[in-house]
């Protein structure tokens, strides 16, 4: 079994630290501004581990960090350590869940607000060397014809090599996400990233956060143990049946 990282060892690509750090409006606004290239004034407190479920029968969704701006545009930001091979369809599902919870009965579809799903990953999902891949719906038959349905999905690659079309600040941010150190923050020459480092330091030295981290780890270990025990029990049943 892999050794548990201490809270001090976590990087921003680790979901626990990411959610704790980003559940702060000023921090999330700064990161969104670096990614999108414009200021995003949030209207309510950013939410970590926000759950959305339409019905008890539907698969629920837990957004790592969720926020809405003063124009009601929705932002879901995720970190993903491993390529699970389902990320394009997962982001489609996330986008759909945001839409389902946006309109009240009787409201017109034209009132559906824009929504962004942003995923940050330490691998190149599409193999093209880009730091940033942005997707919108468009027409196959007419190049350049956009659907303008308000849905945007962005995949950020910390291992990019092609800096065309992205800011140096975004490249430095992605580097900092993977190696969240004071040295990388200082070397970024970005006030926003240096401010982000201060937020990280506050979280890592917060006693209550440390307790939450240990509790989360213990719950995960318990789930794994229960899963192993269920697997062993099932294996014994199958063995008896075959015998």
Residue ranges and their predicted role:
Residues 1-242:
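Elongated, amphipathic alpha-helical interaction scaffolds
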């Amino acid at each position: 079994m892999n050794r548990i990282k201490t809270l001090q060892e976590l990087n921003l690509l680790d979901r626990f630290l990411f959610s704790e750090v980003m559940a702060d409006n000023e921090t999330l606004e700064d990161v969104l501004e670096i990614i999108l290239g414009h200021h995003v004034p949030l209207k309510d407190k950013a939410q970590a581990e926000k759950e959305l479920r339409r019905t008890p029968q539907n698969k629920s969704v837990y957004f790592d960090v969720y926020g809405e701006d003063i124009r009601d545009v929705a932002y879901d930001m995720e970190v993903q350590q491993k390529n699970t091979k389902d990320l394009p369809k997962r982001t489609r599902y996330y986008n759909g869940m945001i839409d389902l919870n946006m309109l009240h009965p009787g409201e017109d579809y034209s009132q559906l607000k824009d929504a962004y799903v942003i995923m940050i990953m330490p691998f190149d999902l599409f193999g093209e060397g880009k730091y940033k891949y942005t997707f919108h719906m468009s027409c196959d038959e007419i190049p350049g014809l956009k659907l303008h349905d308000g849905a945007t999905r962005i995949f950020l690659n910390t291992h990019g090599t092609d800096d065309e079309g992205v800011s140096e600040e975004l490249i430095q941010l992605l580097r900092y996400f993977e190696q969240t150190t004071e040295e990388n923050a200082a070397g970024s020459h970005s006030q926003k990233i240096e401010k982000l480092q201060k937020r990280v330091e506050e979280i890592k030295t917060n006693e209550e956060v440390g307790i939450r981290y240990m509790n989360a780890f213990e719950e995960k270990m318990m789930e794994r143990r229960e899963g192993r025990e269920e697997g062993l029990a099932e294996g014994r049943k199958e063995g008896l049946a075959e015998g």
